[in-house]
A protein has these predicted regions:
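Nucleotidyltransferase catalytic core that binds NTPs
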Residues: 1-207
Length: 207
């Protein structure tokens, strides 16, 4: 991918080959709709991982979920911007800009152009159960560190899941603040979080 391809994304152009050492958390999802659980994870990541910013990556479509009942991309971006109203949060639809629908291709395209920065993938433990089903999951784990936050259920089940195995080595809980500057494959688990809300629950409550 040419440098100009990433430069077309206005909000990212200033980061290309710049901001050496800047630590960025990436929280991806359909955000259909975004909710306070997403916001809580983003804020916890910002604080506990010593991040400079958190980027909310609104996906065009989750390959593991049905598109039935999914709001338009523009509507989901709009709602996400409203809930992610924080000076250190940015809402992006990079998948749409770069014409891709999976995280592996997205990371392969942006990481070389943001090589002076430290990026870390943020997700809830519910996604950890399905991580082994992601497109080229093992290769993704070799590209970027992961921070996993406990959601609904036992942390033990998450830590022993197939997705956890694919992610590889788990960092000791006493060293979680170093996760964003650690070399992948590596991941960390934040136990002392319990987020019970989900986009699915919100959608069903409106039916």
């Amino acid at each position: 991918m040419a440098r100009s391809d990433l430069s077309k994304i206005k909000i990212l152009s200033k980061y290309i080959y710049n901001n050496k050492g800047l630590k960025i958390g990436l929280i991806g999802g359909s955000f259909n709709p975004p909710h306070n659980g997403h916001l809580k994870i983003a804020k916890l990541a910002l604080k506990n991982l010593n991040l400079d910013e958190v980027w909310w990556l609104v996906s065009t479509k989750n390959p593991l979920k049905t598109s039935k009942g999914q709001m338009s991309l523009s509507k989901r971006v709009e709602l996400t911007k409203k809930i992610a109203n924080h000076p250190k949060f940015k809402v992006l639809n990079i998948e749409n800009n770069l014409k891709t629908k999976n995280s592996y291709v997205l990371l392969k395209k942006i990481l070389p152009r943001l090589s002076n920065m430290k990026l870390i993938w943020i997700m809830g433990s519910d996604n950890l159960f399905n991580f082994s089903k992601w497109y080229k999951a093992k290769k993704i784990s070799n590209l970027i560190p992961f921070a996993v936050f406990n959601r609904r259920g036992s942390p033990l089940r998450s830590i022993n899941s197939k997705g956890a195995y694919v992610l590889g080595k788990r960092i000791n809980s006493s060293r979680l603040k170093l996760l964003s500057i650690s070399e992948p494959p590596i991941w960390g688990y934040f136990h002392n979080v319990n987020i019970n809300i989900s986009s699915t629950i919100i959608r069903r409550s409106k039916e």
